[in-house]
């Protein structure tokens, strides 16, 4: 696997995990879900990320999920596997296992959470993972979830490693601009914030790793295409209509809103695993109206939530 599989990919969906009511993974729901995403312009899939509720998935469940998705996708789009933990040794072993498993363009490794490493600790952590495996690594920098933030300078140190191929950046547009300006040519920068996609792409980002593409993939594709064609007027118009939908999709802890919309669409992705809980019926109704534009007035109103969510 190599960076070439992802070089031209702009819209990556961070795949949710469908569950039965008893909390077991609903593998039968995966084919319809994945076909829905591919029909609406998803160009790659991230498995076992935050949106997949990965903290509640066992290691064996993640491997079973990888195998199931690979069988359905059958090479049609690149796949990225979530491999990172806050234990360097565990992350190394997982990256090795995924490399041996095969079929993945890269592994996504999150900045270590809870133990709050220094910048040097972060550097050593990712270097150790990248040194130990042939699996290309994408760093996931999301301080809202892990408390600590990798600085752009640390990121650029790691970008020199031949096996670290990119970052999913969820900090600030200022950091993203700095990274894009100073990164090596073959280092990919993705925004992990749906609400920032318009700005990030105009700064020169390679793409977006998205939650909203589950429900609004056509709009995202149209916006990205307009930016690619230098039609900023059209792209900006799409972004203005898109922002309330992003707000709705992050108005309560994710992925509860996106699951509510997908269930409404008949995709049967089911509930969430505790400690996350589903939207209330009233929350779900409001979110669905905004995200699917079933009520234009609701879309115009302020929806609780922010473009850069804490969830």
Swiss-Prot record:
The active site is at residues 140, 168. SUPFAM superfamilies: Aldolase. InterPro entries: Aldolase_TIM (IPR013785), DapA (IPR005263), DapA-like (IPR002220), Schiff_base-form_aldolases_AS (IPR020625). The record marks 50, 114 as: Part of a proton relay during catalysis. Disulfide bonds: none annotated. GO terms for biological process: diaminopimelate biosynthetic process; lysine biosynthetic process via diaminopimelate. Pyruvate binds at residues 51, 209. It catalyses: L-aspartate 4-semialdehyde + pyruvate = (2S,4S)-4-hydroxy-2,3,4,5-tetrahydrodipicolinate + H2O + H(+). Its EC number is 4.3.3.7. It is found in: Cytoplasm. Homotetramer; dimer of dimers. This is 4-hydroxy-tetrahydrodipicolinate synthase. The lineage of its organism: Bacteria, Bacillati, Bacillota, Bacilli, Lactobacillales. The gene is dapA.
């Amino acid at each position: 696997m190599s960076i070439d599989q992802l070089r031209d990919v702009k819209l990556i969906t961070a795949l949710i995990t469908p569950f039965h009511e008893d909390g077991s993974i609903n593998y039968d729901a995966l084919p319809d879900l994945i076909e829905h995403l591919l029909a609406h312009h998803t160009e790659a899939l991230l498995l076992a990320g935050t949106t997949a509720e990965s903290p509640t998935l066992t290691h064996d469940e993640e491997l079973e999920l990888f195998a199931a998705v690979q069988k359905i996708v059958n090479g049609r789009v690149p796949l990225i596997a979530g491999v990172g933990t806050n234990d360097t040794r565990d992350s190394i072993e997982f990256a090795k296992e995924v490399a041996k498993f095969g079929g993945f363009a890269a592994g996504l490794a999150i900045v270590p959470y809870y133990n709050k490493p220094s910048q040097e600790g972060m550097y050593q952590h990712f270097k150790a993972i990248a040194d130990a495996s042939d699996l290309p690594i994408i760093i996931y920098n999301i301080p809202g979830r892990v408390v600590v933030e990798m600085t752009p300078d640390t990121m650029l140190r790691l970008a020199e490693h031949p096996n670290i191929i990119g970052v999913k950046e969820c900090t600030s547009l200022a950091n993203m601009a700095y990274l894009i300006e100073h990164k090596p040519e073959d280092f990919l920068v993705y925004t992990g914030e749906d609400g920032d996609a318009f700005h990030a792409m105009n700064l020169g980002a390679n793409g977006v790793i998205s939650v909203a593409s589950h429900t609004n993939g056509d709009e995202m594709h149209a916006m990205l295409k307009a930016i690619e064609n230098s039609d900023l007027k059209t792209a900006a118009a799409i972004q203005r209509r898109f922002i309330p939908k992003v707000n709705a999709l992050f108005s309560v802890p994710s992925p509860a809103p996106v699951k509510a919309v997908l269930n409404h669409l008949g995709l049967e992705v089911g509930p969430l695993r505790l400690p996350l809980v589903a939207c209330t019926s009233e929350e779900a109704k409001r979110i669905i109206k905004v995200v699917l534009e079933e009520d234009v007035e609701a879309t115009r109103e302020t929806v609780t939530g922010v473009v850069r969510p804490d969830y």
